[in-house]
């Protein structure tokens, strides 16, 4: 799911 992948990317960016 591309939407979920983008969400994970955002989380990693915040970390």
Swiss-Prot record:
UniProt feature coiled coil, ranges: none
Q: Which residues form the signal peptide?
A: none
* UniProt superkingdom: Eukaryota
Which cofactors does this gene product need?
A: Ca(2+); Mn(2+); Mg(2+)
Q: How is the cofactor bound?
A: Binds Ca(2+). Mn(2+) or Mg(2+) can also be used to a lesser extent.
Q: Name one GO cellular component term.
A: extracellular region
Tissue localization of expression is: Hemolymph.
Principal cellular location given in the protein's record: secreted
What's an example Gene Ontology biological process for this entry?
Answer: humoral immune response
The entry's localization annotation reads:
Secreted, Extracellular space
Q: Which UniProt keywords apply?
A: Hemagglutinin, Lectin, Secreted
GO terms for MF: monosaccharide binding
Q: Assembly and interactions? A: Heterotetramer of two 80 kDa subunits and two 52 kDa subunits.
For this chain, the family text in UniProt reads: Belongs to the tyrosinase family. Hemocyanin subfamily.
Q: What does this protein do?
A: Sialic acid-specific lectin. Has hemagglutinating activity towards erythrocytes from several species, with high activity towards, rabbit, mouse and guinea pig erythrocytes, and low activity towards human erythrocytes. Hemagglutinating activity is blocked by treatment of erythrocytes with V.cholerae sialidase.
State the name under which the record lists this protein: Lectin 80 kDa subunit
Q: Which organism is it from?
A: Penaeus setiferus (Atlantic white shrimp)
